[in-house]
UniProtKB/Swiss-Prot annotation:
The keyword GTP-binding applies. GTP binds at residues 24-31, 74-78, 133-136. This is ADP-ribosylation factor-like protein 3. GO terms for molecular function: GTP binding; GTPase activity. GO terms for cellular component: cytosol; Golgi apparatus; nuclear outer membrane-endoplasmic reticulum membrane network. GO terms for biological process: Golgi to plasma membrane protein transport; intracellular protein transport; protein localization to Golgi apparatus; response to endoplasmic reticulum stress. There is a cross-link at K50 (Glycyl lysine isopeptide (Lys-Gly) (interchain with G-Cter in ubiquitin)). It is found in: Golgi apparatus. Interacts with SYS1 and SLO1. Belongs to the small GTPase superfamily. Arf family.
Length: 198
């Protein structure tokens, strides 16, 4: 009888775990975003001034509430590392694509890179959140300019949830709003991409 009750208790108390892939070109602020996110959820985080370019991946698991866990994979954005992004597509429930809104010169490269992500069949139906990072800088592009680039790609996304939001990973502005947007989409998409229960 004890084992039955224990089994029922464990089953009812399982948490949904969703995996979110953080992508973007090198120097877009992906790791800063992840470390700021950890700080927002009161977890141990790396001092922002100590962040180095990611070679490989950074992983963080963030308990959002009593029922959900978000597992983030921050994958290096250097051109030589982008070929390994596709290895994560079938495992992810959502994608956050971070754009350096102060780097106009790489906007075309960013657009081409995002388009190659969107066109991959493995992420069909996965919500995509594009974050216009570094909005705290004076030389930033307006969010509307970045949306225009994203809108050209959005026609390939069809009915999938997608959005462009402004953030500053450095100051934390907009970071929690972005995650809240993603959580709603992950729950909405539960039937086509079920979470892992932990």
């Amino acid at each position: 009888m004890f084992h039955l009750v224990k089994g029922l208790y464990n089953n009812w108390n399982k948490k949904e775990q969703y995996s979110i892939l953080i992508l973007g070109l090198d120097n877009a602020g992906k790791t800063t975003f992840l470390e700021t996110l950890k700080k927002e959820y009161s977890l141990a985080f790396k001092a922002l001034e100590k962040i180095q370019p990611t070679v490989g991946q950074n992983v963080a698991t963030i308990p959002v509430d009593s029922k959900q866990i978000l597992k983030f994979w921050d994958v290096g954005g250097q051109e030589s590392l982008r070929s390994m992004w596709s290895e994560y597509y079938s495992l992810c429930h959502g994608i956050i694509f971070i754009v350096d809104s102060s780097d106009r010169e790489r906007l075309d490269e960013c657009s081409t890179t995002l388009q190659s992500v969107v066109m991959d069949e493995e992420i069909e139906g996965v919500p995509i959140l594009m974050l216009a990072n570094k909005q705290d800088r004076q030389d930033r592009m307006e969010v509307q300019d970045i949306k225009e680039v994203f809108n050209k790609i959005a026609e390939h996304i069809s009915a999938r949830d997608s959005r462009v939001l402004p953030i500053s990973a450095l100051t934390g502005e907009g970071v929690k709003d972005a995650i809240e947007w993603m959580i709603v989409r992950l729950e909405r998409n539960k039937k086509s991409r079920p979470p892992i229960y932990k």
